[in-house]
């Protein structure tokens, strides 16, 4: 579409076109659900759409209101997110009243990063739920009258982190919003929202990013070298959040460890495989072990592609290893192993001991040798 500034959100032209049609109709719903994977531009699109709605003329988003929208400044934007619980906090306290000075400083820094880079994923320790007190504050925000902005917004990040009580409290705000008030509920897990919430929102779906778009955003918005961005984007599943998780690792080391663990487990060298995995469990970081499982699954999926004669692999520099694997383990039930590895990844979220999970990873991979070799 001509002059659609929403296309500045890379890789989301379909969502941008839908929102532009809504903008052109001037029939603006009071609530949107932006649904799609983490790290694909949902928050950025909400900000750009609100800028567009408040622009004095189409394509002109340089007004002072637009700047305040970009800065997530109240009373233009109410930004709601998960927060840690403070010491002795009760439902009568405000969302931040009982937080320590250190946590408040961390929150301030994280919000500043989000303002500077709308693709940034806020990471606040202990922030696991959206507090009902945060939802109740929306009523106060709605009661303000402010004529400088034609449209104001409530942006709820990771809306699925509201429990049922918080969602029911939100319903009251959704049912009778004042004129010019828009809600943006942003989540990768829309099915965790109550049907009564979903029925009041206009759903806009967001797609995983294409590799070239993801690489370009990594370069432009995160300052990643192009060569590194191109390599990372291949393994990122179309998500900047996943890409940044990979960037936090030594990526070449991660690939090397993945191959070594597979090689040792398949050779039944349990101690060597366990030693390699121990570097992912030593820090007691569930995220690192989850990442390793994802990399192993990616390699096994590449092996399945090779077996089917497909040529495009994520582990493209190891195509020879994939061929040797399929020659040796032609009867391997890769799908079953991948299914069990996914179960192990989910069990990490249930606080199962990481060392127990590490042993199970090795045993699942070793099972390929027992059942995958073609009999003579």
Summary of predicted features, one role per range:
Residues 2-161, 165:
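Clamp-loader machinery-focused feature within the broader ASCE/P-loop NTPase space
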Residues 140, 172, 199:
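Conserved adenine-binding aromatic site and its adjacent loop/helix in ATP-hydrolyzing domains
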Residues 143, 168-179:
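Conserved catalytic/switch belt of AAA+ P-loop NTPases
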Residues 148-153, 178-184:
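Loop/turn-to-beta-strand initiation segments
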Residues 158-162, 174, 190:
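Conserved Walker B
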């Amino acid at each position: 579409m001509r002059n659609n500034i929403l296309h500045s959100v890379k890789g989301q032209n379909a969502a941008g076109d839908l929102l532009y049609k809504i903008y052109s109709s001037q029939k603006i719903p009071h609530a949107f659900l932006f649904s799609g994977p983490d790290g694909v531009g949902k928050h950025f699109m909400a900000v750009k759409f609100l800028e567009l709605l408040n622009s004095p003329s189409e394509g002109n988003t340089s007004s002072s209101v637009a700047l305040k929208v970009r800065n997530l400044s109240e009373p233009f934007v109410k930004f709601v997110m998960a927060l840690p619980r403070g010491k002795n906090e009760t439902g009568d306290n405000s969302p931040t009243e009982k937080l320590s000075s250190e946590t408040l400083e961390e929150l301030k820094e994280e919000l500043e990063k989000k303002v500077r880079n709308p693709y940034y994923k806020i990471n606040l320790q202990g922030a696991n739920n959206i507090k009902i007190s945060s939802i109740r504050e929306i009523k106060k925000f709605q009661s303000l009258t402010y004529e400088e902005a034609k449209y104001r917004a409530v942006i709820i990040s990771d809306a699925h982190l509201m429990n049922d009580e918080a969602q029911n409290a939100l319903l009251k705000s959704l049912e009778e919003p004042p004129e010019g008030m828009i809600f943006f509920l942003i989540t990768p897990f829309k099915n965790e929202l109550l049907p009564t919430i979903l029925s009041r929102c206009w759903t806009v779906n967001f797609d995983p990013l294409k590799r070239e778009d993801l690489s370009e955003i990594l370069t432009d918005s995160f300052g990643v070298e192009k060569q590194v961005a191109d390599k990372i984007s291949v393994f990122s599943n179309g998500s900047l959040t996943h890409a940044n998780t990979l960037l936090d690792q030594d990526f070449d080391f991660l690939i090397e460890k993945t191959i070594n663990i597979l090689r040792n487990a398949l050779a039944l060298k349990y101690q060597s495989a366990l030693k390699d995995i121990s570097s992912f469990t030593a820090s007691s970081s569930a995220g690192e072990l989850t990442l390793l499982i994802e990399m192993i699954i990616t390699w096994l999926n590449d092996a399945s592609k090779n077996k089917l004669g497909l040529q495009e692999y994520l582990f493209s520099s190891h195509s020879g290893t994939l061929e040797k694997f399929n020659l040796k383990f032609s009867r391997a039930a890769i799908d079953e192993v991948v299914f069990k590895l996914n179960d192990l990844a989910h069990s990490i979220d249930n606080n199962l001991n990481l060392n127990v999970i590490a042993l199970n990873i090795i045993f699942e991979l070793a099972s390929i040798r027992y059942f995958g070799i073609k009999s003579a």
